[in-house]
Regions:
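N-terminal small/glycine-rich loop or linker at the start of catalytic domains
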Residues: 1-10, 51-65, 97-99
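Active-site-adjacent beta->alpha loops and helix N-cap segments on the catalytic face
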Residues: 39-49
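Active-site acidic/histidine proton-transfer and metal-coordination neighborhood
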Residues: 63-164, 174
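Anion (oxyanion) recognition and catalysis
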Residues: 26, 45, 85, 119, ...
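Feature marks short, surface-exposed loop/turn motifs that line or immediately flank catalytic pockets
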Residues: 12, 39, 57-61, 98-100, ...
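Hydrophobic residues in well-ordered beta-strands that form the structural core
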Residues: 51-53, 131, 167, 230
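A short beta-strand-loop structural module common to alpha/beta enzyme folds
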Residues: 31-39
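Histidine-acidic metal/acid-base catalytic patches
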Residues: 1-27, 34, 88-90, 145-167, ...
Length: 253
């Protein structure tokens, strides 16, 4: 069964207080929240919600494509695997980091080597490390894992059932489009999804170009049984946006 969640940072603190956001998400029907900061893990639990994903390490600009960061990142990721196992968090989000002149082939090789160091630990804990694909055109200039084929090659080199992609529909629409065909082709390597409207990273409404009913149906047809996390910034009433997104997507999942 596919579940829905919603990203913390899109609503807190600019739109809602932490408590109001968590209560609104629960009231709207969401079983989980994405990217919850550590200081609010207990708040989410108190409202009966799960955490669908957290960052495996920080920052996203200095990531796994740097050999000189691997010792630090291994420790951070191992620590967060322990937290994830304890709290029942299924996914830890990993980042390539920025290119800074590094060519793609070398970046892929180094990123894969970094993930190999923690893959077995993730397997033993039952936690999936998902490498996030982000656009380098609009939101994250110079980010290296900015195309599906880049992330896919990393996952192939690591060759672990617990190392997959976080396929961000908004980001990949900006970089390459062809969303449904890509999902159908590489779905076995996708461990988590993010949504948002494009352009603007706002609601999944008719003011943006992505037709989410067809995209969600395509995801369902692959047999995916994980979480789809909404990562849009609401333009209007945040609570109404939470409710509308859940209700719009539910019939297709």
């Amino acid at each position: 069964m596919i579940t829905q969640s919603v990203a913390w940072w899109c609503f807190v603190p600019e739109k809602l207080t932490p408590d109001r956001f968590v209560r609104a998400a629960a009231d709207a029907g969401y079983p989980a929240i994405d990217l919850v900061p550590p200081e609010y893990w207990s708040l989410v639990s108190e409202h009966g919600l799960a955490i669908s994903a957290i960052a495996a390490h920080q920052p996203l600009t200095i990531g796994l494509n740097r050999f000189d960061q691997h010792d630090r990142l291994e420790k951070e990721i191992r620590d967060n695997i322990i937290h994830a196992q304890r709290l029942g968090i299924r996914n830890l989000i990993c980042f390539s980091g920025n290119r800074e002149g590094l060519d793609d082939a070398k970046g892929i090789e180094i990123t894969a080597a970094g993930l190999v160091r923690v893959a077995q630990v993730a397997e033993e804990a039952g936690v999936t490390l998902v490498l996030e694909l982000l656009n380098s055109k609009v939101d994250h200039p110079d980010y290296q894992a900015d195309h599906t084929r880049w992330g896919l090659r990393v996952c192939q080199l690591v060759s672990s059932p617990r190392v997959k992609l976080l396929y961000d529909i908004y980001h990949m629409q900006i970089m390459e489009g062809d969303i449904i065909r890509t999902i159908r082709t590489v779905h076995g390597m996708i461990g988590h999804y993010h949504t948002a409207g494009n352009p603007g990273r706002n609601e999944l409404d008719e003011a943006q170009e992505l037709y989410y009913p067809a995209i969600l149906q395509a995801i369902k047809e692959t047999g995916y049984a994980g979480c789809i996390a909404h990562e849009f910034v609401p333009k209007g009433d945040p609570i109404a946006s939470l409710q509308t997104a859940f209700q719009q997507c539910a019939p297709y999942l």
